[in-house]
Curated annotation (Swiss-Prot):
The gene is ddl. One of its GO terms (molecular function) is ATP binding. It holds the Pfam family Dala_Dala_lig_N. It comes from Streptococcus agalactiae serotype V (strain ATCC BAA-611 / 2603 V/R). The lineage of its organism: Bacteria, Bacillati, Bacillota, Bacilli, Lactobacillales. This is D-alanine--D-alanine ligase. Pathway: Cell wall biogenesis; peptidoglycan biosynthesis.
């Protein structure tokens, strides 16, 4: 049986590029090499495409993918050179220029099947403010928030936030993930500092009510036939689940499945499915919820390309459902081909 070619795109221009490398290295070790031949392309911090390793069998344990520190510019190619008539692309890219519709649009121009959500749902989910506006239309509960757009009246935004929200308040760039650029404000001074920090990453800022809550996550998989996992819980050893806590300091553990009652579990799974469909998503996503002590559920975020490291919540959630990491990758490839065939069948 001939092997299918799977192209891993990783790295990228966003602040989440290091997470992308970790995810890609985990994926390349989980792939079933009896079924796939793997090509890898590294996207540098400035957007160059670099042709990197190819794997016909499981790489050795010490094999590392190219990074910005080890990049070989002699292997630079034109972005369109990744085209392969019979390949499926797995864009293991997080954040802007990765899961915001940009790379998805590029791959659709090339007419290549790709793992993950489409252009529209990627771009909607990448913007936290737009996501909130869309999900409000289908009745998915969310915490109170205000917004600030660079160039608008900052003093008015701060005044409105102080009048309608109470400390602690979380300030987030609208278009960033992995907790990059997010900070917690406990007074007006730190609120201003938090907005300044967020503006370094985006011109659209979400100012959100902080809640004392457990962080519960649900995995989503499918195209028309959407499946969800039992929830998993992020158990924190830190006050705020930031980028370093997630990926550097290892200050979190996960409880899978989460210890929640059946009614709460079912409600979260239904909200996750409803949110996924509301943004027109396909392939995969992870829905992140807050669960308060009095049982209130709030959807915090919809992540269309969740972390894929061996310790990431998304693959672990599916493993708990009986789907191994390797089988999950095969399922995602199948869903990618299914969506590609549907796109190609549409008249334009």
């Amino acid at each position: 049986m001939s092997k299918e070619t799977l192209i891993l795109l990783y790295g990228g221009r966003s602040a989440e590029r290091e997470v992308s490398v970790l995810s890609a290295e985990s994926v390349m070790r989980a792939i079933n090499y009896d079924k796939f031949f793997v090509k890898t392309y590294f996207i540098t911090q400035v957007g160059q495409f670099i042709k990197t390793q190819e794997f016909d069998e499981m790489p050795s344990s010490d094999e590392k993918l190219m990074t910005n520190q080890t990049v070989d510019l002699d292997k630079m190619v034109r972005p369109s050179d990744i085209y392969d008539d019979n390949a499926i692309v797995f864009p293991v890219l997080h954040g802007p220029m990765g899961e915001d519709g940009s790379i998805q649009g590029f791959l659709e121009v090339l007419r290549m099947p790709y793992v993950g959500t489409n252009i529209l749902s990627s771009s909607v989910a990448m913007d936290k403010i737009t996501t909130k506006q869309v999900l409000a239309t289908v009745g998915v509960p969310q915490v109170a928030y205000q917004t600030y757009f660079e160039g608008d009246d900052l003093e008015h935004a701060i005044k409105l936030s102080l009048e309608t929200l109470s400390f602690p308040i979380f300030v987030k760039p609208a278009n960033m993930g992995s907790s990059v650029g997010i900070s917690k404000a406990t007074d007006e001074s730190s609120l201003r500092s938090a907005i300044d920090l967020a503006l370094k990453y985006d011109s659209r800022i979400l100012i959100e009510q902080g809640v004392t809550a457990r962080e519960i996550e649900v995995g989503i998989l499918g195209n028309n036939d959407v499946k969800t996992t039992f929830p998993g819980e992020v158990v924190k050893d830190v006050d705020f689940y930031d980028y370093d806590a997630k990926y550097i300091d290892n200050k979190i553990t996960m409880d899978i499945p989460a210890k929640v009652d059946e009614a709460t579990m079912e409600a979260m799974r239904q909200y996750a499915s409803k949110a996924f469909k509301a943004i027109g998503a396909c392939g995969l996503s992870r829905c992140d919820f807050f669960l308060t002590k009095d049982g209130q559920i709030f959807l915090n975020e919809l992540n269309t390309m969740p972390g894929f490291t061996q310790w990431s919540m998304y693959p672990l959630l599916w493993e708990n459902m009986g789907l191994t990491y390797s089988d999950l990758i095969e399922k995602l490839v199948m869903l990618a081909k299914e969506m590609f065939e549907k796109r190609e069948s549409h008249l334009i």
